[in-house]
């Protein structure tokens, strides 16, 4: 089963800045997106719901320091990417 990654314009702007600051993470970031698309519940992503506000968001790990926040729509199998950055930037 495959999921649809939805890149909003806002996310693409955040992503562009993130990759410009961290070009060394490009391969790991691409692998994380591929895993999200194939199996968002893969243990290495450490997918978990975020507590508090805003509600309805989840977090997936790129590595120990960087995360992707996302909305997970299981019925439509859509994953709406919200933000990417360090732990402090996305929470």
Can you say where each PLM-predicted feature lies in the sequence?
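A short, surface-exposed loop/turn module that caps and links secondary-structure elements
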Residues: 35-60
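Enriched for short, Lys/Arg-rich terminal
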Residues: 4, 13-16, 20-26, 61-91
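Generic recognition of well-ordered alpha-helical segments
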Residues: 13, 31-34
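Short alpha-helical linear motifs
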Residues: 31, 52-55, 70-75
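Residue-level signal for beta-strand positions within conserved beta-sheet cores that form or flank
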Residues: 1, 43-46, 77-80
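Short N-terminal amphipathic alpha-helix/helix-capping patch enriched in small hydrophobics
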Residues: 25, 29-32, 46
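Basic nucleic-acid-binding interfaces
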Residues: 1-3, 9-10, 55
């Amino acid at each position: 089963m495959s999921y649809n990654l939805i890149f909003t314009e806002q996310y693409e702007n955040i992503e562009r800045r993130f990759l410009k600051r961290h070009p060394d993470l490009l391969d790991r970031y691409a692998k994380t997106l591929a895993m999200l698309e194939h199996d968002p519940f893969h243990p290495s992503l450490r997918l978990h719901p975020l507590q508090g506000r805003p509600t309805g968001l989840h977090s997936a790990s790129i590595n120990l320091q960087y995360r992707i926040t996302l909305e997970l729509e299981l019925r439509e199998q859509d994953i709406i990417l919200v933000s990417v950055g360090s732990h402090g930037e996305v929470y």
